[in-house]
C-alpha cells in the first residue's frame, strides 16, 4: 500500500513537471514574431525586454530561400503581432496564410524604396517612391529589400514598430525604450556620416548588393559582384576589377552565406583583403558600425 502511494506521488510530480515544460512559464509563447533577426533587436529595445520575441529566419539561413515550418506557422497564429520588412518573398506568402491579417505589420511603410538591387553598372543614387502596398514585391521583382542596413531607414522602421506595439499594448508605456533607441540610431547616423566624409574613397566592392540603402544615404558607390542572383562572367569580373582599381577601392565585402570562390579571385586581383560581414546579425547598430568602419578605413 505504501509503495503504491509513493508511486502515485511520483507520477503526479512527473506529470506536473511535464505540464509546466509544455505549457508553463519555462516555455512562454512568443507574443511578437519578427521575420529576421535585426527586427528582434528593434522590438527588444523598444519594449526593454518586457515582451517575448520570436524570430522566423534562424541564424545562418537565407531569407531568400526560407520557408516557415508548420510549427512556426502555429507560433505566428498564436502571436499578437507579426513584424516584417514587407519586402521578402516568404513574408508576402505569410500574409496569404495567416488568419488574422491585422496582426501582420509592414515596417517598410514610409521608406523611400530603391528600385532594383544595384549592380556595378548601375548608379546607387537612382531611386523611386513606392506606396506601401508595392512593398510586398520581392527584390527579384525590382525592389531592394535590405532596408535594415542603413540608420536612416532603421529610424523609420523603429517608428513603425513602436506605433504597432503601442497600438497592441495600450496599457504599457514603451516610449522611453523607443526614444532611447532613436537616440542611438541618431548617433549611428552621425558616426556613419563623419566616417564616410573622412574616407579616401566612397566606393566599395561587395559580393551580394545588400548595402544599397547605406550607399544612397552617404553618397557611396556599391560595386556588386553578383547580379540578379547570378555569378558574373569572366568578362564582368574583369570590369569589376578595373572599376574598383580606378576608384581606389580598399575593401571587398562578402556575406557568409555566399560562395567564396569568386570573392577570392576578385580580392586577389584587386590586391585587397576580403572581409566577411553579416547584415542579418541580431544587432543592426553594431553591424552597421562595423561595416562603416571596414568601408571607410579599408580594413
Predicted regions span which residues?
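Bacterial N-terminal signal peptides
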Residues: 9-20
Amino acid at each position: 500500500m505504501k509503495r503504491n502511494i509513493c508511486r502515485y506521488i511520483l507520477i503526479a510530480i512527473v506529470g506536473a513537471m511535464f505540464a509546466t515544460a509544455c505549457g508553463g512559464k519555462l516555455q512562454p509563447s512568443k507574443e511578437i514574431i519578427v521575420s529576421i533577426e535585426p527586427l528582434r533587436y528593434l522590438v527588444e529595445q523598444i519594449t526593454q525586454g518586457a515582451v517575448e520575441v520570436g524570430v522566423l529566419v534562424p541564424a545562418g539561413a537565407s531569407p531568400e530561400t526560407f520557408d516557415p515550418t508548420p510549427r512556426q506557422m502555429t507560433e505566428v497564429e498564436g502571436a499578437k503581432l507579426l513584424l516584417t520588412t514587407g519586402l521578402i518573398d516568404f513574408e508576402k506568402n505569410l500574409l496569404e496564410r495567416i488568419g488574422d491579417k491585422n496582426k501582420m505589420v509592414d515596417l517598410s511603410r514610409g521608406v523611400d524604396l530603391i528600385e532594383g538591387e544595384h549592380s556595378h553598372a548601375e548608379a546607387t543614387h537612382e531611386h523611386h517612391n513606392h506606396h506601401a502596398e508595392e512593398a510586398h514585391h520581392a527584390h527579384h521583382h525590382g525592389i531592394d529589400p535590405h532596408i535594415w542596413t542603413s540608420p536612416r531607414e532603421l529610424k523609420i522602421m523603429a517608428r513603425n514598430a513602436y506605433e504597432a506595439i503601442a497600438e497592441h499594448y495600450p496599457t504599457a508605456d514603451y516610449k522611453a525604450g523607443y526614444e532611447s533607441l532613436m537616440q542611438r540610431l541618431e548617433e549611428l547616423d552621425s558616426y556613419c556620416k563623419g566616417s564616410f566624409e573622412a574616407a579616401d574613397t566612397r566606393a566599395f566592392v561587395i559580393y551580394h548588393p545588400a548595402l544599397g540603402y547605406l550607399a544612397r544615404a552617404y553618397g557611396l558607390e556599391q560595386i556588386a559582384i553578383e547580379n540578379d542572383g547570378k555569378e558574373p562572367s569572366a568578362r564582368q569580373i574583369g570590369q569589376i576589377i578595373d572599376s574598383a582599381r580606378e576608384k581606389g577601392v580598399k575593401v571587398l565585402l562578402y556575406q557568409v552565406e555566399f560562395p567564396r570562390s569568386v570573392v577570392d579571385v576578385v580580392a586577389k586581383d584587386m590586391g585587397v583583403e576580403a572581409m566577411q560581414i553579416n547584415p542579418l546579425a541580431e544587432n543592426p547598430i553594431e553591424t552597421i558600425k562595423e561595416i562603416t568602419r571596414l568601408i571607410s578605413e579599408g580594413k
